[in-house]
């Protein structure tokens, strides 16, 4: 038991602390529940987006294999080496989700026309162009997926932190404060009874002396 002065002022302070702790506990539980709901919604978005990325990459690789069949592996490799994108840009910003700051990614200059990819369009299979187009689309989706998965990680960390704070209040801080409040209330009651009996004893002695004085 924490050492505390059993006074009415201390009891009032404890009552206010309990009220504040219970209010904080309620707000944190609401925040935790809202974070969990948001977390599972974003998990669902990530799952859908991951399926899209996998499907798009599968289509792109299928077209790439067909282009290799028509053009040959060496020609496809040469075209791929020529197709580097120097204009590709990624901007990073932040947004707020339920009080959690998460990054946002914006990618630019991903999609290009046939003549902008660095290799000559002449003598190149249309399947190579299709593959390049689908890889570009997949890159946009992957950037979006990276943003969502980073948000998931940060939200999960915030949920864990909030749960710990809720549990600390619910199972440690509030019970401890209530225990102290009970202890002080009991001590004040004891002190009040002691004072009552002491005053009663003093009154009895005074009355006895007065009675003895009257007798003399």
From Swiss-Prot:
Q: Which UniProt key words apply to this protein?
A: ATP synthesis, Cell membrane, Hydrogen ion transport, Ion transport, Membrane, Transport
pH dependence per the entry: Optimum pH is 6.0 for ATP hydrolysis.
Q: How does it sit in the membrane?
A: Peripheral membrane protein
Any GO BP: proton motive force-driven plasma membrane ATP synthesis
Q: What is its main location?
A: membrane
GO annotation, cellular component aspect: plasma membrane; proton-transporting V-type ATPase complex
Key word Chloroplast present: no
Q: Which InterPro entries match?
A: V_ATPase_D
Q: Where is the signal peptide?
A: none
One MF term in the entry's GO annotations: ATP binding
Q: How does activity depend on temperature?
A: Optimum temperature is 80 degrees Celsius.
- Which proteins does it associate with, and in what oligomeric form? The A-type ATPase is composed of subunits A(3), B(3), C, D, E(1 or 2), F, H(2), I and K(x).
Report the function annotation for this chain. Component of the A-type ATP synthase that produces ATP from ADP in the presence of a proton gradient across the membrane.
Please give the record's comment on domains.
Purified ATP synthase is 25.9 nm long. The hydrophilic A1 domain is 9.4 X 11.5 nm, the central stalk is 8.0 X 3.9 nm and the membrane-bound A0 domain is 6.4 X 10.6 nm; the domains are connected by two stalks. ATP is synthesized or hydrolyzed by the A1 domain while ion translocation occurs via the A0 domain.
Matching entries from PANTHER family are given as: V-TYPE ATP SYNTHASE SUBUNIT D
- Name the record gives this protein: A-type ATP synthase subunit D
Which species does this protein come from? Answer: Methanocaldococcus jannaschii (strain ATCC 43067 / DSM 2661 / JAL-1 / JCM 10045 / NBRC 100440)
Gene that produces this protein: atpD
